[in-house]
Amino acid sequence: MVRVNYIGFPDGVKGNAEKMHQAYLMALEQAEEKLGNINWDEYEDIVFIGKSVGTVVAGAYAEKYKLSLHLVLLTPVQETFEHVTGSAIAFHGTSDPWARTEDIIKACEGRIPLFLTEGANHSLETGDVEKDIQTAGQTMKRITAFIK
C-alpha cells in the first residue's frame, strides 16, 4: 500500500476554479513523484482510493498511465468525472459544500454506483455521531465488496 499525501495547496481553493486547477496540478505532480517508481505491470489488482481533490488525481493518474484499476471516490468533486474511465464507486454527502449533489448524481448516472449520505458534509459526517459511525461502517462494507 502506498499513501499519497498532498501539501502546499493555495488558500481559497473552494469556489475558485483557477485555484482548484492549480491544486489539482500540484497534487498530480506529487502523486507522480510518489508513484513514479512503481512497476504497475507487476500487479494483478490495483485499487486507488481518493478523497476530495484526491479523487480527481486518482482518476487522472490512472487515465494518464493507462492503468486498469478499481477506483474508490470518497466525496468526489465535479472535476473527478472527467477522468474516470474504468471501474469506480462513489460516496457523497448531500450537504457537501464542495460538490452539488445534482451534479454528482448526473455524473455517476448509469456508470458509477453512487451512495448518498443524507445531510452529510465533505467528510461524510452529519454531526450525529451514531449515524456517522454507521455510515463509516456501511461505506467500508461497500468498498470491501467492490474491490473483491
Feature-to-residue mapping (PLM):
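Serine-hydrolase catalytic machinery in alpha/beta-hydrolase-like enzymes
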Residues: 1-43
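Gly/Ala-rich beta-loop-alpha elbow adjacent to hydrolase catalytic centers
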Residues: 49-58
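Active-site signature of alpha/beta-hydrolase-fold catalytic machinery across serine-
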Residues: 60, 64
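A conserved short beta-strand
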Residues: 66-78, 86-87
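Conserved alpha/beta-hydrolase "acid-adjacent" motif
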Residues: 82, 97-103
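Short, proline-enriched alpha-helix->beta-strand connector loops that line the catalytic pocket
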Residues: 83-88, 110-112
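Short beta-strand/loop motif that positions the catalytic acidic residue
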Residues: 90-92, 96
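Catalytic histidine-centered segment of alpha/beta-hydrolase-like enzymes
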Residues: 120-135
